Amino acid sequence: EILGNIYILAVLNMILMGDGSSQIICGDSHKEGPKFIQSHKDTFPANVFLLNPPYSAPGKGLIFVDEALSRMETGYGAVLIQENAGSGQGDVYAKRILEKNTLIASIHMPDDLFSGKSSVQTAIYLVQVNRPHEVDDVVTFIDFSEDGYTRQNRKKATQKVNLRNTDHALERYDEVAAICLG
């Protein structure tokens, strides 16, 4: 993680979740990553990742997804990505990703997910690593535009909490997880 404050949050989160051995790096993954991988005998020991790549990067962020997937041998990835990332300039990366990995699900997220920060429409892509996507593979598409939360515009919010569970949000997220995990 390149941002120091986010790095600290990530480390604290892992410790609170009982994983004190996570080797989270504070720095640019393109500069620090190769050193880390070299020191781990050219393997990336993760079998799962959660990635929110910068949408301004090549392929609308899919270059980061492609790189993360290429460093894993097995496992799964969850990517919070610009919904149209797989088309236009992202098309080349999407094709390369699917040649080696399987898209399990695409989850359309609420329009106001990043209200006050960004107006980009996002989706979560769930991917199985190192299993080429076949033409007859079933992909689950979920419209999760109504997730049960009400959000306030972060720039205009006067409340400390701008996210309120107003319509069974926790149950809705549990249902989506159950659908995706089978």
Model feature map: region roles:
Residues 1-48, 54, 58, 81-84:
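Conserved S-adenosyl-L-methionine
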Residues 26, 43-182:
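A conserved structural/catalytic subdomain of Rossmann-like adenosyl-cofactor enzymes
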